[in-house]
């Protein structure tokens, strides 16, 4: 069973950085000024690999925030007072 995974960021540029790190081909879109990536995960392990890719990209690129939504859950990454890009 496929699970829809939605990744949201502060901007399309931030979403493009994350899309490059995902283990599947993904494209970033802009929606109401936010960056959005939509992908389908085939398993819990693949969902976890998406979350790990977002986490790595978030830290490496010093993004302001990112949110991963899947099933009825979400994982939020925030800068919390650290200097950020952009």
Regions found by a protein language model. Give the residues of each.
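Ser/Thr- (and often Asn-) enriched beta-sheet segments in non-cytosolic proteins
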Residues: 4-8, 36-39, 67-69, 76
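Serine/threonine-rich low-complexity intrinsically disordered regions
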Residues: 11, 25, 40-43, 69
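Short, low-order "capping/linker" segments at domain edges
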Residues: 41-53, 70-86
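Short amphipathic alpha-helices in soluble, non-transmembrane regions
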Residues: 18-23, 48-59
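Short amphipathic alpha-helix segments
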Residues: 6-28
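Conserved short beta-strand edge segments in small beta-sheet-based binding/regulatory domains
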Residues: 27-32, 55-75
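Short, flexible coil/linker elements and helix-boundary hinge sites characteristic
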Residues: 1-3, 21-23, 62, 75
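Short glycine-rich, basic-tinged beta-strand/loop micro-motifs
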Residues: 1-4, 30-45
């Amino acid at each position: 069973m496929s699970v829809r995974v939605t990744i949201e960021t502060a901007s399309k540029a931030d979403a493009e950085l994350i899309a490059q790190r995902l283990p599947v081909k993904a494209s970033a879109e802009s929606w109401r000024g936010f960056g959005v990536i939509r992908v389908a995960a085939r398993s819990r392990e693949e969902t976890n690999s998406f979350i790990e890719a977002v986490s790595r990209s978030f830290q490496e690129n010093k993004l302001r925030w990112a949110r991963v939504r899947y099933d009825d859950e979400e994982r939020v990454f925030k800068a919390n007072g650290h200097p950020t890009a952009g």
